[in-house]
Amino acid sequence: MGLPKSAYKKLLIDCPTRVINKNCAQRVKDVSPLITNFEKWSDKRKKLYFKDEEEMVGHFHLENFNLKNNLYGRLLASPMRAEKISKLKSCRELLIPLKVVPSTGKDQHADKDKLKLVPTLDYSKSYKSSYVLNSASIVQDNLAAATSWFPISVLQTSTPKSLEVDSSTFITEYNANLHAFIKARLSVIPNVGPSSINRVLLICDKRKTPPIEIQVVSHGKGLPITQSVFNLGYLHEPTLEAIVSKDAVTKGIYLDADNDKDLIKHLYSTLLFQSVN
């Protein structure tokens, strides 16, 4: 015995609203793995950004290591870049930046079809660049494969014959540029003396002393402070030795690590470049 039509109508149309899910018409938001699992598939760590880091340190009673005032902390805090020899990432300030420029022939005219890779002192976004380890001995051992140091974008769009690296002048050119920059800055920079707390002392000692040394010395009322000592005698550059040794009283030049950041960075790069690995 079948149900009357009125019963069907009541079941299909006049269904009580309490049995209907009001949210059934809403579409579930798509959750992309690009957002939820980005750090897993991209091999990148999560980063936390704070508007005011000093306020966070004080509010949560965190220990402040004052890395902003630390010479080596600033070097290690530079952006990470992949370098071409070891294929590993390192701090940008510990590498040699290379730039791509048009190659010039014997007539000193640029050849648009040829590109040359040369070392430079500072990174710039105005040209295509890559990086290699800041070590003269390692660079010398790998100069035979120097054309592979070009940026990937250049290697993909150029033929091997159009890429050039002058292996005979590569190391000497970079070294000469570093020395010229340091000489120019040291000849005009003031000697702050041992009064500066955050300081770097430049000396010229040809004995078997390390090129870079950290010393603990007394300051003011006998309070101990640390200072970095850069031994430019390690470079065997007579002009630099004369500049550093001209003050017989202090027997060196004191630099302010806060105001002379650029000069100190290039001094560190020079000593690192010529150090024996």
Curated annotation (Swiss-Prot):
InterPro entries the record matches: Rrg8 (IPR031415)
Matches recorded under Pfam families: RRG8 (PF17068)
Location of the protein in the cell: Mitochondrion
Keywords linked to the UniProt accession: Mitochondrion
GO biological process: mitochondrial genome maintenance
Main location: mitochondrion
Gene Ontology cellular-component annotations: mitochondrion
Superkingdom, natural source: Eukaryota
Similarity field: Belongs to the RRG8 family.
Function statement: Required for respiratory activity and maintenance and expression of the mitochondrial genome.
Protein name as annotated: Required for respiratory growth protein 8, mitochondrial
Lineage, top ranks: Eukaryota, Fungi, Dikarya, Ascomycota, Saccharomycotina
